[in-house]
Curated annotation (Swiss-Prot):
Keywords assigned: Carbohydrate metabolism, Hydrolase
Top-level division of the source organism's lineage: Bacteria
EC class: hydrolase
GO process terms (BP): carbohydrate metabolic process; glucosamine catabolic process; N-acetylglucosamine catabolic process; N-acetylneuraminate catabolic process
Protein's name according to its UniProt entry: Glucosamine-6-phosphate deaminase
Catalyzed reaction equations: alpha-D-glucosamine 6-phosphate + H2O = beta-D-fructose 6-phosphate + NH4(+)
């Protein structure tokens, strides 16, 4: 596990972009795994400004809310289109279908996509409870793409994106921890003091399902990029 501490979110995002650009330029990155939320927003803004050619790059996404149409402004389809896909051309892009009526079939479909498009670099954020994707504490390290019941703390953290608290979905489709660990390389981004405890447990704590991100200690190629605040407890 390589640890990089930067001055702020912009510097950290630029460092992540350097790794991604190099992988695309050398042809090592054919599939790029993407995350959502506030953490990668600056990375995507920098990627849009970059001259790197992404027209031969396929993207996959970690998760999507259950019950939201792709056109819903709170969906991750909408988020990705708004921040990245409408501004930068990719070969093809895959996300779970939030409107799927058969959850089991949708999870199997998405896992098949991940098998057909092995992820070369997976970008991750981390929740204050150590979740990666929507894999909450207690999730099996052997999990594949699955339907998740969102915890109160995760819904609380995400309610700022919704007009009303009751509008925050209760379920999501998420790549499983095993699905994430199948990526050849992982870049974990964390910025801000509120992520410091989760980062401490991820890097220095035991590998335990109560901190899902701690499983990254077992991955052969992880780069953790932090700002000074997120690194403050290390």
């Amino acid at each position: 596990m390589q640890l990089i501490t930067t001055e702020n979110k912009l510097a950290g995002s630029k460092k992540a972009l350097e790794i991604i650009e190099k992988g695309i330029t050398t042809g090592e990155v054919n599939t790029l795994g993407l995350a959502t939320g506030s953490t990668p927003e600056t990375l995507y803004a920098e990627l849009v400004k970059s001259d790197v050619d992404t027209t031969n790059v396929t993207t996959t996404n970690l998760d999507e809310y259950v019950g939201l149409a792709a056109s819903d402004p709170n969906s991750y389809h909408y988020y990705m289109n708004n921040l990245l896909f409408s501004k930068k051309a990719f070969k093809e892009s895959f996300l779970p279908n939030g409107e799927a009526t058969d959850a089991e079939a949708e999870c199997a479909r998405y896992e098949e996509i991940l098998t057909e498009h092995p992820i070369d670099i997976q970008v991750l954020g981390i929740g204050t409870n150590g979740h990666i994707g929507f894999n909450e504490p207690g999730t099996s390290f052997d999990s594949l793409t699955h339907k998740v019941v969102l915890t109160d703390s995760t819904r609380e953290a995400n309610k700022r994106f919704f007009e009303r608290e009751e509008d925050v979905p209760t379920h999501a489709y998420s790549m499983g921890i095993k699905s994430i660990m199948n990526a050849k390389k992982i870049i974990l981004l964390a910025f801000g003091e509120n992520k410091a405890q989760a980062i401490k447990e991820t890097i220095k704590g035991p590998v335990d399902v109560n901190c899902p991100a701690s499983v990254l200690q077992n991955h052969p190629d992880v780069t953790v990029i932090l700002d000074n605040e997120a690194a403050s407890l290390l």
